[in-house]
Amino acid sequence: MLKAVHFGAGNIGRGFIGYLLYKSGYEITFVDISKELVESINNYKRYNVIILKDNVEKEEVKNIKAIHIEDEENLSKAIVDADIITTSVGANNLKSIGEKLRNYLKIRKANIDKPLNIMACENALFATNILKNSILEKGDKDFIEYVNQKIGFPNTAVDRIVPNVDIKKELPIDVAVEDFYEWDIEKKAIIGDLNIKGAELVDDLEPYIERKLFLLNGAHATTAYLGYLKGYKYIHEAIQDDFIRNIVSKMQEEASIALSKKHNIKIDNLREYSNKVIKRFKNSYLKDEVVRVGREPTRKLSGNDRLMMPAKLCYEIGITPKFILYGIAAGFLFDYKEDPQACKIQDDIKNFGLEKTISKITGLEENSDLLHEIVKKYKELKETFRKR
């Protein structure tokens, strides 16, 4: 049986990546920092994926085990034997995962000659490159040559909503997911054979990554931040609001025009994708909280993420990203007290002023037209929703 090692045994790891790897015939070793989660996986040796739709379905995932990330002996054995390594740990953690992998791959190099593919399945642009660079960073010439010859590092675009929904479970490690999923993999970077059921191998990944980042992640964040301002708890409630849905649909249209021009994609295909995204947001079975979707606003409002990237692309090609900027402005009004990044943004606005805070997070110059437009939208939304 083929063997997979997956870093990150959370909801995405179990409900999406692990689910498809199991369906593709892999035995899966999850690696995680949580001792409790590792013990649970090893105790139950299986879990259920609950697919949330009108007729709820349940699929069992078996042939699994787990290793704590500090269990060097067993993790070393797993890496040596692996046919594929994947991650869903958050892009901010890839550097540290790469540093650990470097040491284990040196052991693998001394013990086995078979090819390996390593993929970071994260909500970030070209996340596998981040992981690869971390692995190679302190490697000697011999190690770098081995990695380049024997290990493939395909970038990926992954998409499945896995909310923290309160639902009856057979096992504590069961996970609930939406019916939709998409996993696009960079074909040219694969070494050897890679067959993952339900994944699509593509020649040029960038259009897929940006389509998902702008039209799904950007729209999701906009729905969350505006929904928070209007007092909604769930995404499916927020997207039913005419004011919010109008802004979200129009920001998708702005981003679609920019994507169409950049990548020569048919605009009708992007509009169809956008409509499917809105339909997914309306899924009331997900009970996806706006504060979950809006969390970590410093990252989501940064210059190379889901809102600023399409805004800058629009501006570059002569489109005023009016509705994308509403999402960005709403993000700076997201003051959820249990989110450390949201609290820090509000403190910075109070201590250093709005313009300096926006500039610091987005990377825009304080005197730039885009920043001034964000300030205008911020003041408009603040006045409308009386945020103090």
Curated annotation (Swiss-Prot):
E.C. designation(s): 1.1.1.17
Annotated coiled-coil segments of the chain: none
Cysteines paired by S-S bonds: none
Catalysis: reaction(s): D-mannitol 1-phosphate + NAD(+) = beta-D-fructose 6-phosphate + NADH + H(+)
UniProt cross-references to InterPro entries, sorted A to Z: 6-PGluconate_DH-like_C_sf (IPR008927), 6PGD_dom2 (IPR013328), Mannitol_1_phos_5_DH (IPR023028), Mannitol_DH (IPR000669), Mannitol_DH_C (IPR013118), Mannitol_DH_CS (IPR023027), Mannitol_DH_N (IPR013131), NAD(P)-bd_dom_sf (IPR036291)
Annotated binding of NAD(+), by residue: 4-15
Name of the molecule in the record: Mannitol-1-phosphate 5-dehydrogenase
Classification of source organism: Bacteria, Bacillati, Bacillota, Clostridia, Thermoanaerobacterales
